[in-house]
Amino acid sequence: KDLRTDQLDRLTKSKTFCMIPWIHMHAFPNGQAFPCCLADSHHPIGHLHKNTVKEVWNDTPYKTMRKNMLEEKSCKECTKCYEQEDMGFVSMRNSSNKNFGNNIGIVDQTLEDGTFEDFKLRYYDIRFSNLCNMSCRTCGGWFSSSWHDEETALYGKREYPKFMFAGKDKEDMWNQLQEHIPYLEQVYFAGGEPLIMEEHYRLLDELERQELFDVRLIYNTNFSKLKLKTKHVFDYWQRFNNVSVGASL
């Protein structure tokens, strides 16, 4: 599809525009919501234990980001991408504009204050929980349940529980995300450890049921467990057309 000059300029020449706030939201296992996984962790755009994904979608922080981007203003959440670009690297902003630029037409629906009513998540990076079977030194209790006992022994009682969920409870986030599955283009699985999470296999089952085999699957996994009960991840991967795995070995 041919793009208008202004659309092409946004995707390739703008120093601040990014497709992410129109297609995506990222959630920590503790419920904090961010535009993406590289966003400044000091500036969450909401909390999914207090509000739904849909409510955060058009709450003031996310609306302000969209408005700033369309006005070619910088966003405090995006400093990591700006820094990478200043050093000559390809940033997540750059790659997102390339990978999701096919959606640039929806940006025209954005209201003057940054409100965007076309609530369809095309890219998931929701850390359903912190469930993990390892306690890697580069991690901690927020992203690995296996760290909790060690942290408690070292520092005393923790301010957060051993097991955490992105939503208000184990089922909440899954229930909110199901309606977006038909629109998915990409899913990033991390955790916790995604290959031992029930939600991971539920999502793959649903993608398979809807025959969405062109959805790009990207993994950050310790690769120590390849199955959950009777479900083996290799049986799923062979059915999808684009699977990328980052494995800790």
Regions found by a protein language model. Give the residues of each.
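Core AdoMet radical
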Residues: 121-131, 142-169, 181-200, 210-229, ...
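Local cysteine-cluster metal-coordination motifs and their immediate loop/turn environment
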Residues: 20, 35-38, 74-86, 131-141
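A C-terminal junction/extension of Radical SAM enzymes
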Residues: 1-33, 102-112, 117
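C-terminal accessory region of radical SAM enzymes
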Residues: 1-8, 38-85
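Recognition helices and adjacent regulatory flanks at domain boundaries
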Residues: 88-122, 132-134
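A short acidic/small-residue loop/turn micro-motif
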Residues: 16, 40-43, 144
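Short Cys/His-rich "knuckle" micro-motifs
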Residues: 88-92, 140, 147-149
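Generic structural signal for small/hydrophobic residues in well-ordered secondary structure
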Residues: 28-31, 53, 81, 128, ...
